[in-house]
Structure formats: structure tokens, C-alpha cells
Amino acid sequence: MDRQISVPIKKEDALSLRAGDYVTLTGTIYTARDAAHKRMQEALDAGESLPIEMQGNVIYYMGPSPAREGRPIGSAGPTTASRMDNYAPKLLDLGLGAMIGKGKRSQAVIDAIVRNGSVYFAAIGGAGALLSQRIKKSEVVAYDDLGTEAIRKLEVEDFPVVVVIDSQGNNLYETAIKEYQK
């Protein structure tokens, strides 16, 4: 099923998505990679607030290349999501609506997705230049000292993703293999 979803994502939208759905996202998403996740965890451990609101928001695991003149961002392909698996359950418990990355997730992350009615999307690896064309604005909003791993606020329009793990725990990486083996 092809769906158009506004982000931040509404709970009813997240709950209605199924593994394998093709989705385009329009609105605001945030980027964060390993170093930013580590710093957010340190802030939480110290009893500090996070630099971005989690409720309903979407984090894209991505660190862009430098922007060409006249563009808001350079190549913007996904990074391997499993590197954030130690941090994702806590952020999901704080209300994170969805994550975008590539690759498999740990069982702890899948359990947190189900527990919180969230979703994990995949973006196409190797298509960063094409994906960047769907990013209309980019602004560093936290951890500027981390360079490419700083947290960015992105305005996206018709940003293409696929639901890999839905709010019921259905996992496209597992079901696709079973379907192929028939």
C-alpha cells in the first residue's frame, strides 16, 4: 500500500502502517547518528532535557555530505540503524514516533516499537543524492561540534521510505525472506 504521511507522525498513522507499505513523508524530521545518540543518553543520565522533543517525531539515522551551492544539504543516505540500538528503546519510551535507517534492528528495539506503537522505516541505501532532493531545508539544531553527526532539523517533501517494522512487530526483513523461499 502506498501512503502519504505528515510528520511529526500521528499515533493513529503509525498504528495503521504495515510492514511492506511504501510511504512518503512530508514535514519535519530530525537527524541523529551514533555520537548524537550517545550525547542524548548522557543528557538523560544526568537528568537533563533533550535538545529536541521526542513526542511523535521522526529521527533519520543520517550524516549528510556537504551541500552544493544552492542546495540545503548534500547526499543524505541512511546509515546502519543497529548502531543506535542501545539508545533507541529509551527514546521510543519517551515518545519517539518513528526511525529511518537501513538494516536490521535488535529484539529490544522491536519490543520497544510494539510497546510504544511506533514504526521503523528504511530508506534506500546508496540513493543519498536522490533522497537529498526531497529535503527542502536543513538546519543544525543541536551538538554543532559533532559536525556531520550534529542533530539537524530537516523539512522534507514526499520523502520515500518503506515500513520495515510496524507497530505490531511485523518485520519485512523476515517476511520477505519467507516469501522468497516459497
Please name every model-derived segment.
Residues 88, 164-182:
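Active-site/ligand-binding-proximal alpha/beta "capping" segment
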Residues 31-32, 36-159:
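Feature captures the catalytic cores and cofactor-binding loops of soluble hydro-lyases/lyases
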